[in-house]
Amino acid sequence: MKNKGLLSASLALMMALPMQAQKFEDNFENKTLRLDYIVAGDSVNQAIYFEQAYSNPTWAGRKTRLDEKFLNGNGQVTVYEHGTNKVLYVNTFSTLFQEWQLTQEAKHLQKSFESSFLVPFPKKPVDVSITLSDTHQKVTAELRHTINPQDIL
């Protein structure tokens, strides 16, 4: 009898989980938002600067499990519902700048590198966070800013 109750509770929980998953169409259009940044610094210091945003005609990325991080990289792009910390989309990456930071040149020279990230095109304003981390996953630089899709051509 105890097993039947446990089985029933497990089935109810499994049926409820898919209902909580976000739908792509609720927050995003079937388009791509390309975000361009400049990442600059040397072997010790780094900074992130927003350059511009572009709209591309279709979204070719995943449309399910948008708020799940599948791999750890040296960086992360996260799209939040504007004004809240609700994650709408997350993806990880590693930049050429972070590889360059490990070179001898980076010990005595500052450089900047362009980086572009593709995210689903939001229907409403969103907050975007770009985070860079070291090899121990300690955050070394972060930029968070608002993107209004009506301002993008």
Protein language model regions, located:
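N-terminal prosegments of processed precursors
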Residues: 22-115
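Residue-level signal for secondary-structure boundary sites
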Residues: 17, 85, 136-138
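Extended acidic/polar, glycine-enriched regions
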Residues: 109-153
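Serine/threonine-rich low-complexity intrinsically disordered regions
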Residues: 3-5, 103, 148
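Bacterial Sec-dependent N-terminal signal peptides
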Residues: 1-25
